[in-house]
């Protein structure tokens, strides 16, 4: 595989770096966002064209691929920013592009690209762990469409999403792939209850309960009962973007840790002079290169056209991110000492984000079964 970047890639990365440096100053990274800050940053990302990056041009996008998404995710990871980029632009956007009719894409994608609205995929359910195929939420057909009843858990940025792409079962039972259908549901529709909560890293997710929610027939994405392949592809695209984000987080983690070791003194000498610390930093640098390679491989596999290869590479990358991310985060905290556990120390926020990324969409043990 050729992992080299062309001039357009470098220009994109530089533009996102400038945006992050302005919107996420280093001394404030990891701090909780106010609603005004979140709205302003989201509008700024829309202004740069990041929110419609993979969308068709006639829907307000720039028709870029997963490598460009990877570069953006890496820079957002360095800044501990991005908000709903993975949930809305990557995962929900992929579902709309793969399943939506031209009319449906024109209906929803321009709003996502402009930042006027966010979307999120309501996928997982209670007791299913990471098995996204175990869907019990029922969609009952009516003369005007469908009626949805059930509950979804851990919907990323679910309490800020105006559009929910709900994976429901129209036929079959248990964990059958056949019978899954995606519905576009307005989050403010009657019968939709969204209960938001903070995640470990200070971001947001939500539990969504749907009680007799009426969905019109023009809000069904794709052929009823045949959505499984598209859902899996969108999920893999989101996982690849998360792996890229983890690369950025680890890169920033290394920079902050190295600076601490250079400036902090013990026994009259900087910590960087101690061999054990040098070995730890060398291990971290090696791990970062591993993560970069696997994140690139996962991104390039997203549009490779071979689902089996995509699944293997994306899951292999997620295994490495889940294992090394937590390990590197805790190692950086240890190199900072007790202060590394505090909210005032930026390293603690990088570590928490890596732990969350390691759990999202499947942990190491789950993806090892999939490789």
Language model features by range: what are they?
Residues 131-149:
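Cytochrome P450 C-terminal beta-domain/meander region
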Residues 1-83, 99-104, 111, 115-116, ...:
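Alpha-helical interface subdomain recognition
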Residues 115-126:
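A short, Trp-centered hydrophobic/proline-enriched beta-strand micro-motif
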Residues 122, 149-193:
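A short core secondary-structure module
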Residues 134-136, 154-155, 186-220:
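Flexible, small-/acidic-enriched active-site or ligand-binding loops
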Residues 63-72, 131-135, 185, 214-215, ...:
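Structural signature of FAD isoalloxazine-binding scaffolds in flavoprotein oxidoreductases
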Residues 120, 136-138, 163-167, 171, ...:
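Conserved hydrophobic/aromatic beta-strand scaffold that supports enzyme active sites
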